[in-house]
Curated annotation (Swiss-Prot):
Pfam families: Ribosomal_L20 (PF00453)
Protein's name according to its UniProt entry: Large ribosomal subunit protein bL20
InterPro entries noted in UniProt: Ribosomal_bL20, RIBOSOMAL_L20_CS, Ribosomal_protein_bL20_C
Organism domain of life: Bacteria
């Protein structure tokens, strides 16, 4: 005869612990809890990847808004920085745009200079 004792109990206890805080039967019933925990883990996996995309979009929006206050579009600003040899990633640029607008204005001026020098040459 097959004994399902300790390991079965341990497995169920683990699932119900992961389901703590869920609404209704999803934290009481093992079957419902298991379904919800599996779904939650899928969401967690998917959203770890989506988070990276969403933050990049947010940084680009912030940089674009700050660049437009300085008379440049996002693409012109980024191109100007590349021509000027300024190598800052989007996260850093977005932080500068929010926390230190004066520095961002100086970066925008450098980008404008680099663009005008390239077009003059």
């Amino acid at each position: 005869m097959r004994v399902k004792g300790p390991s079965s109990k341990k497995h169920k206890k683990k699932i119900l612990k992961l389901a703590k805080g869920y609404y209704g039967a999803k934290h009481r019933s093992f079957r419902r809890a298991k379904e919800q925990v599996l779904r939650s883990l899928q969401y967690e996996y998917r959203d770890r990847r989506l988070r990276k995309r969403e933050f990049r979009r947010l940084w680009i929006q912030r940089i674009n808004a700050a660049a437009r206050l300085n008379g440049l579009s996002y693409s012109q600003f980024m191109h100007g920085l590349k021509l000027a040899g300024i190598d800052l990633n989007r996260k850093m640029l977005a932080d500068i745009a929010v926390a230190d607008p004066e520095t961002f204005t100086k970066l925008a001026e450098k980008a404008k200079e680099a663009i005008s020098q390239k077009s003059a040459a």
